[in-house]
Amino acid sequence: AGMEHFRSLEGPCVFIGNHMSTLETFVLPSMIQPWKDVTFVVKESLLKYPFFGPVLGSREPIVVGRSNPREDLVAVLEGGEARLKQGRSVIVFPQSTRSSVFDPAHFNTIGVKLAKRAGVPVIPVALKTDAWGNGNLLKDFGPVDVKKTIHFEFGAPMRIEGTGKAEHQQITEFII
């Protein structure tokens, strides 16, 4: 629901959403790409999987190692701003890791900071994709529970004003 919010939006934006499963990594780009060129912030280890890694790498993602938060911040802000200036939108999952329960305390402001720095709007994204669980051998590829419903909802675009705290709170409330 809410795809009209980015379909009619001129220029690139930052999509900010919660992160429940690997499903978002597959589905979000295919939902957005017909209207906006898009990439995302991904953990480096995802690029090492056979088949999945090269497909993901073809989107020219912003890669973070998740071992040095300062380096990751620089990578997201600089890499994200460069892609946004090229006209490519960026998907950010500020929780940094998947969780079947949304916890606002673990939802950081990196996406808001990126949008403010680049001067582009944010599109909040509320996701319910816990139908795809974590795997035993490979955490990123687990079983799919076909009885569970998935849900993707896009909010209205918002510009980041001032510190961005109010917008971060609005995004958090949209997801909840």
Would you name each region that the model predicts?
Residues 2, 38, 51-53, 89, ...:
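A cross-family acyltransferase "interaction/gating" segment
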Residues 12-14, 87-93:
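Residue-level preference for the first positions of well-ordered beta-strands
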Residues 1-11:
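N-terminal signal-anchor transmembrane helix
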Residues 20, 24, 72, 103-107:
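Short, glycine/acidic-rich beta->alpha junctions
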Residues 45, 69-73, 104, 168:
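A conditional alpha-helix N-cap/helix-loop micro-motif detector
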Residues 31, 55, 82, 113-114:
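Hydrophobic/aromatic ligand-binding patch that stacks against planar heteroaromatic rings
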Residues 9-68:
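Catalytic core of membrane glycerolipid acyltransferases/transacylases, capturing the structured
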Residues 96:
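Active-site metal-binding loops of divalent metal-dependent hydrolases
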